[in-house]
């Protein structure tokens, strides 16, 4: 061993210095992202909260889902509809980023952009960056989505109520390792074409009635490839640079919601991706220590689209009133939403999974006309109170909800712009939610516009 030194036989002092530097480097985790997530079954008004935060954001990103999500944002009296584009694209000073966890239907992306261009959205393609690792939704994925729904209806007498945007079939291809990504489309097109044909044939063998114009679709895809090429980056490197360069405000816009999450939602009536906080790390390629504030968006009552258990649902004049006053129709599907009282069991469960740092309580004004308002505070199963949210749908159908009845305010809140403008009973309603959740409410929404979000702190 002469002439060499054992690794643990270093000259005094050298190891300590190196370790200290590494500890400092580890401590410099970089910027933290702010996350906005739905805390119920979607349609909570996430777009409005994102829009509020996006005004001073440097980067606004989507991390999961596809054009099955629907966000409506009103700016200067104009209503923009977003499905795949981050709604931060309205902010001309921000970069919008579509992460690897998102599934992208290119025809849908350009169609959506063109619709919003007609309403005044300018130069969006200069502000959009797309991860090269994002998977592609093909037209046949969308066709299969519809065929699967028909099959489910025939076999089980019920369907999931998907948006038929091809999201589930695309995530299935991804999990089966047969999917194709943006990076595949932009490299060797012959190789891409061969894999595309294989994938198309696989789907045709499973669904014999499926018709696919393979050559026509490939021709269109080749055209889209050239249009998106300038927007595509290595998404992991892009996010790393964004978080470790000069300080930046990075906002993550969740699509869908906690109870639609593939793991934690009311399975099987869920979407096909993780729309809870874990999906931010896997869908953007960032570590947990870069997650900052996580804002949960909560509607002042509860809505749900399609079938599945809904403990606080009101199939009566209260449900109709909420549906009509709240204009509860889906942005993506136009379907009527089911309505019911606020359910704190759902919210506590969403908080367990996501660790909300604060809440946004939206559409409080919809409750303005009620003389009393009920809030679901706990569930009973076979006469016993249960502390958890049941995983099994049949059990969730059977729970008995315990309600607390609060006085209504019977006053118009739509003109309120600060906390003091709200009637005392409306303030009590907000505080009741805070106290039961153990999470502060940061915003209260009393209307459609940006100005109607009251900030509390």
Swiss-Prot record:
Catalyses which reaction(s): IMP + L-aspartate + GTP = N(6)-(1,2-dicarboxyethyl)-AMP + GDP + phosphate + 2 H(+)
Regulation: Weakly inhibited by AMP non-competitively to all substrates. Inhibited by IMP non-competitively with respect to GTP. Inhibited by fructose 1,6-bisphosphate competitively with respect to IMP.
GO CC terms: cytoplasm; membrane
Binding site for Mg(2+): 43, 70
Sorted UniProt keywords: Cytoplasm, GTP-binding, Ligase, Magnesium, Membrane, Metal-binding, Nucleotide-binding, Purine biosynthesis
Residue numbers binding substrate: 43, 331-337
Swiss-Prot/TrEMBL cofactor(s): Mg(2+)
Domain of life: Eukaryota
Coiled-coil region list: none
GO biological process terms, semicolon-separated: 'de novo' AMP biosynthetic process; AMP salvage; aspartate metabolic process; cellular response to electrical stimulus; cellular response to xenobiotic stimulus; glutamine metabolic process; IMP metabolic process; purine nucleotide metabolic process
UniProt cofactor note: Binds 1 Mg(2+) ion per subunit.
Topology term for the membrane: Peripheral membrane protein
Residues annotated as binding IMP: 43-46, 68-71, 163, 177, 256, 271, 335
pH dependence: Optimum pH is 6.6-6.9.
Principal location: cytoplasm
Tissue localization of expression: High levels in muscle.
Pfam family, one: Adenylsucc_synt
SUPFAM superfamilies from the UniProt entry: P-loop containing nucleoside triphosphate hydrolases (SSF52540)
Pathways per UniProt: Purine metabolism; AMP biosynthesis via de novo pathway; AMP from IMP: step 1/2
InterPro entries per UniProt: Adenylosuccin_syn_GTP-bd, Adenylosuccin_syn_Lys_AS, Adenylosuccinate_synth_dom1, Adenylosuccinate_synth_dom2, Adenylosuccinate_synth_dom3, Adenylosuccinate_synthetase, AdSS_1_vert, P-loop_NTPase
PANTHER family xrefs: ADENYLOSUCCINATE SYNTHETASE, ADENYLOSUCCINATE SYNTHETASE ISOZYME 1
Role this protein plays: Component of the purine nucleotide cycle (PNC), which interconverts IMP and AMP to regulate the nucleotide levels in various tissues, and which contributes to glycolysis and ammoniagenesis. Catalyzes the first committed step in the biosynthesis of AMP from IMP.
Family named by the database record: Belongs to the adenylosuccinate synthetase family.
Descriptive protein name: Adenylosuccinate synthetase isozyme 1
Lineage start: Eukaryota, Metazoa, Chordata, Craniata, Vertebrata
Name of the coding gene: Adss1
